[in-house]
Amino acid sequence: MAITCMDIPKFLFALLLPPVGVFLEKGCTHHLAICILLTILGYIPGIIYACYIILAY
């Protein structure tokens, strides 16, 4: 779970548009759908989930 230089743009996207950060990390999977739903329901939960996905994978 080390952070690489490729993770920095993903984190920037995760702060601005959380689904984009998840898409760059996992592609078009159920993780993207969950992130979109969380972002619609509340911006902060979407950011937290996106950062979790980027750190976990």
Curated annotation (Swiss-Prot):
Protein name as annotated: UPF0057 membrane protein T23F2.4
Q: Which organism is it from?
A: Caenorhabditis elegans
List the InterPro entries: PMP3
The highest taxon in the source lineage is Eukaryota
One GO CC term, this protein: membrane
Q: Which residues cross the membrane?
A: 3-23, 36-56
The similarity comment for this entry is: Belongs to the UPF0057 (PMP3) family.
Q: Where in the cell is it found?
A: Membrane
Q: What is its main location?
A: membrane
Q: Which UniProt keywords apply?
A: Membrane, Transmembrane, Transmembrane helix
As for membrane topology, the entry says: Multi-pass membrane protein
Xref: Pfam families: Pmp3
